[in-house]
Amino acid sequence: MAGKKGQKKSGLGNHGKNSDMDVEDRLQAVVLTDSYETRFMPLTAVKPRCLLPLANVPLIEYTLEFLAKAGVHEVFLICSSHANQINDYIENSKWNLPWSPFKITTIMSPEARCTGDVMRDLDNRGIITGDFILVSGDVLTNIDFSKMLEFHKKMHLQDKDHISTMCLSKASTYPKTRTIEPAAFVLDKSTSRCIYYQDLPLPSSREKTSIQIDPELLDNVDEFVIRNDLIDCRIDICTSHVPLIFQENFDYQSLRTDFVKGVISSDILGKHIYAYLTDEYAVRVESWQTYDTISQDFLGRWCYPLVLDSNIQDDQTYSYESRHIYKEKDVVLAQSCKIGKCTAIGSGTKIGEGTKIENSVIGRNCQIGENIRIKNSFIWDDCIIGNNSIIDHSLIASNATLGSNVRLNDGCIIGFNVKIDDNMDLDRNTKISASPLKNAGSRMYDNESNEQFDQDLDDQTLAVSIVGDKGVGYIYESEVSDDEDSSTEACKEINTLSNQLDELYLSDDSISSATKKTKKRRTMSVNSIYTDREEIDSEFEDEDFEKEGIATVERAMENNHDLDTALLELNTLRMSMNVTYHEVRIATITALLRRVYHFIATQTLGPKDAVVKVFNQWGLLFKRQAFDEEEYIDLMNIIMEKIVEQSFDKPDLILFSALVSLYDNDIIEEDVIYKWWDNVSTDPRYDEVKKLTVKWVEWLQNADEESSSEEE
């Protein structure tokens, strides 16, 4: 995480007004300015999502307005991508003035790759003094926060294990704003305590799913409800324990999928999370789909009293007209142009003769030509639109230029500073940026400076067909569709622990908390020698035993047999087929990992919890399958190999959790782990799976050295 030098103070706010207030009574807020997603690419390659305008107002302004009305005393803006832009914006905003309702501080955290990283950074900094609001920088809401805070305090008094309250709005009230991250919440009907959480597939996928709840979670619950009609607006009230829990569980990345699901299903933590349900308007701008819908809602005054003509920015001059039309001062409209319902136009914009605009937002200082049709679209500041163009359900970012007779079909995104030549017709869902995005699967379409790119004839022809002879732009091709992309998927594909361990700052406390076992003092022989396990030629491997052995272990787990029965069946099978314990270990590990994979795939448990559940119960089988140091080393090699073969999303977390379980249960000794690690395979295909284990082994070795020093 970023060190102290990454923290910049952006003004005193009302610091003097609250200087005498008890530190614990000061309501703090943490704003996540980065979503750690790619849904708003290619625009977010240039500007952070929180500074993108919605109805000509930067998204962050809506979040800060909410916090001001909520009575927050101190705000921390966590900035990852484009951190300097955000800091500069805040320093020049009203929130940095002496009469600001709160003190605001920007915290540079460029290494953060998910919400979990941010929470661990907060814990390291020690700046959270009590309960705090955790909110995304893309929230739009008119909720009465005092009621949510009252509910939070009430639950905290009634339940000493209460650590967090989620705000969930009812989607039936605002059906079009339903999230593209659907989820099921199982709630205690009488208290709204969250009993279980599960991500759901998108409705468009038509994938069938079911909710599988551990019956133990329903203990002491008289009646529960299953809700999949709730909008998760990512407004949470957290106690100071929340960052610490993220610190102790450094595999937690997502706020819901990892933290909420992990906490409420953990017997060890024993903490509770509650849901505050509201009928008020509370949504996140989490995708292009919700950007479109929320913009129309806002123009339609669904978020009253937060409306465009309230002019929340000091330089705004919007006035409200009938049919939800908003205009700033100094707008020039030709006599024959027609402005339809739900339309906003910024100051300095000129609209030509015969142009028709409906259900759209036009920014400031735009030049809209003659006989243009703009419907259900968004045109940001300083754009130029040539005559006779048609723009349908598209977005044009600031400083873009469209020539005459240009047609943008449904879903087009034109990036900052892009130029489209005359007479161009862009296909649906075309996304264009002004510069190449090499890491995003984009191809170059710039006819003014293409010398550094080696393009074939087809690409050159296609470039002309997209932006025209005088156009400037690069096609952006997302590897994941907007609807499929999510914070969870982004963390999996780009920024997970398994892919970016070198960017994850792990503390010794994080690793030590994962290893609950008290350290044992042992000495490691300096002359011990590791011998590779005897290789068995594939022609002599008994495939029939592996198949039968796996089935035997799976049957034992499915029917919850006791260990002695499972061992007896395996041993009988081993002797009847005349195979070695090496084959028995392979079959057992394969079956256990399949069980782990099943729990993860069905979303019954997270990766770490699934491994702990399976290996804590069935790992004792290995005590009767390995009898010396060499065989335990063989066991660890098999585990690593089979995890790679199984293609887990987080292979390093699976291996780490499995080894910790075996170590905690006294199945594998510490000195054996050291010898295995000193001689572990250097094959590149194992590099990813070993990334977490290296940290754990280092921690074990450091703890050994500290123990030796204490004895001396």
Curated annotation (Swiss-Prot):
Chain positions covered by the region annotation Disordered: 1-20
Domain of life assignment: Eukaryota
Keywords: Cytoplasm, Initiation factor, Phosphoprotein, Protein biosynthesis, Translation regulation
GO molecular function: guanyl-nucleotide exchange factor activity; translation initiation factor activity; translation initiation factor binding
Places the protein is found: Cytoplasm, Cytosol
Protein name from the UniProt record: Translation initiation factor eIF2B subunit epsilon
PANTHER family from the UniProt entry: TRANSLATION INITIATION FACTOR EIF-2B SUBUNIT EPSILON (PTHR45887:SF1)
Subunit structure: Component of the translation initiation factor 2B (eIF2B) complex which is a heterodecamer of two sets of five different subunits: alpha, beta, gamma, delta and epsilon. Subunits alpha, beta and delta comprise a regulatory subcomplex and subunits epsilon and gamma comprise a catalytic subcomplex. Within the complex, the hexameric regulatory complex resides at the center, with the two heterodimeric catalytic subcomplexes bound on opposite sides.
The encoding gene: GCD6
Pfam families: LbH_EIF2B (PF25084), NTP_transferase (PF00483), W2 (PF02020)
Additional observations: Present with 33800 molecules/cell in log phase SD medium.
GO cellular-component term (any): cytoplasm
Transmembrane spans: none
Family: Belongs to the eIF-2B gamma/epsilon subunits family.
Gene Ontology BP term (one): cytoplasmic translational initiation
List of residues that carry Phosphoserine: 478, 481, 507, 525, 538, 707
Function of the molecule: Acts as a catalytic component of the translation initiation factor 2B (eIF2B) complex, which catalyzes the exchange of GDP for GTP on eukaryotic initiation factor 2 (eIF2) and is regulated by phosphorylated eIF2. Its guanine nucleotide exchange factor activity is repressed when bound to eIF2 complex phosphorylated on the alpha subunit, thereby limiting the amount of methionyl-initiator methionine tRNA available to the ribosome and consequently global translation is repressed.
Boundaries of every W2 domain copy: 539-710
Annotated InterPro entries: ARM-type_fold, eIF-2B_epsilon_N, eIF2B_epsilon, NTP_transferase_dom, Nucleotide-diphossugar_trans, Trimer_LpxA-like_sf, W2_domain, W2_eIF2B_epsilon
